[in-house]
Curated annotation (Swiss-Prot):
<feature type="binding site">
    <location>
        <position position="71"/>
    </location>
    <ligand>
        <name>S-adenosyl-L-methionine</name>
    </ligand>
</feature>
<keyword id="KW-0489">Methyltransferase</keyword>
<dbReference type="InterPro" id="IPR029063">
    <property type="entry name" value="SAM-dependent_MTases_sf"/>
</dbReference>
<dbReference type="GO" id="GO:0061542">
    <property type="term" value="F:3-demethylubiquinol 3-O-methyltransferase activity"/>
</dbReference>
<keyword id="KW-0808">Transferase</keyword>
<feature type="binding site">
    <location>
        <position position="135"/>
    </location>
    <ligand>
        <name>S-adenosyl-L-methionine</name>
    </ligand>
</feature>
<keyword id="KW-0949">S-adenosyl-L-methionine</keyword>
<keyword id="KW-0831">Ubiquinone biosynthesis</keyword>
<dbReference type="InterPro" id="IPR010233">
    <property type="entry name" value="UbiG_MeTrfase"/>
</dbReference>
<protein>
    <recommendedName>
        <fullName>Ubiquinone biosynthesis O-methyltransferase</fullName>
        <ecNumber>2.1.1.222</ecNumber>
        <ecNumber>2.1.1.64</ecNumber>
    </recommendedName>
</protein>
<feature type="binding site">
    <location>
        <position position="92"/>
    </location>
    <ligand>
        <name>S-adenosyl-L-methionine</name>
    </ligand>
</feature>
<dbReference type="GO" id="GO:0032259">
    <property type="term" value="P:methylation"/>
</dbReference>
<comment type="function">
    <text>O-methyltransferase that catalyzes the 2 O-methylation steps in the ubiquinone biosynthetic pathway.</text>
</comment>
<comment type="pathway">
    <text>Cofactor biosynthesis; ubiquinone biosynthesis.</text>
</comment>
<dbReference type="Pfam" id="PF13489">
    <property type="entry name" value="Methyltransf_23"/>
</dbReference>
<dbReference type="GO" id="GO:0102208">
    <property type="term" value="F:2-polyprenyl-6-hydroxyphenol methylase activity"/>
</dbReference>
<dbReference type="GO" id="GO:0010420">
    <property type="term" value="F:polyprenyldihydroxybenzoate methyltransferase activity"/>
</dbReference>
Amino acid sequence: MQAHPNTVDPSEIAKFEAMAAEWWDPHGKFKPLHMLNPCRLDYITRQIAGEFDRDLGTERPFAGLRLLDIGCGGGLLSEPMARLGAEVVGADAAEGNLPVARIHAEQSGLEIDYRHTTAEALAEAGEQFDVVLNMEVVEHVADPLSYLRATHDLLKPGGLQICSTINRNPKSYAMAILGAEVVMRWLPRGTHDWSKFITPDELFDLLRQAGLEPVDRKGFVFNPISWQWSISDRDLSVNYVTASLRPR
């Protein structure tokens, strides 16, 4: 297994540690993620169920699957995955997020293994998972290709990675930077760096270079009239998500 340089950007970590206490406030600084979460969960659960032949109508359809949530924050994705039966490890480089995540999981009666660590450190330790959730992280790392190589090594052969990020174009600047940070003030200014955004074609190329096989991509589209998100087969102009496999 190859060595993985640390791709953590300290300035990016500091941004999220400063907001840690607000993770579970649906009207706080993580309001955009709370609004987006139903779409994220719908895509994630369907992809996992399809890949591992699980029936979402059962009580714990993901029982027996080991899942890693990279950049878990306060646990907005880790907790639903645990409720569905997965053995969940939540990893975050921002240590300040983890007390919030642990307390909320305990209050919810969920067993989640939250760790202050990075994808690279877990890969170096030889950890492997059936599923890796890599949601809204890749645009915050210093070296996306090196980071994705680590996430590849974290997957068991045949394992599934779900990776979401933000496209890089004038529309994404208008919506993710000007709209979310300046006009609506959903996020503190500087939360995102537009130059770090990645186009879908660039991400597919990076995933392939990392040894993964991209199998799907969809857009997450925000409707400003209904104030709801939906999944789109065609509109990947701002937020989008991909599914890829580690070959067996």
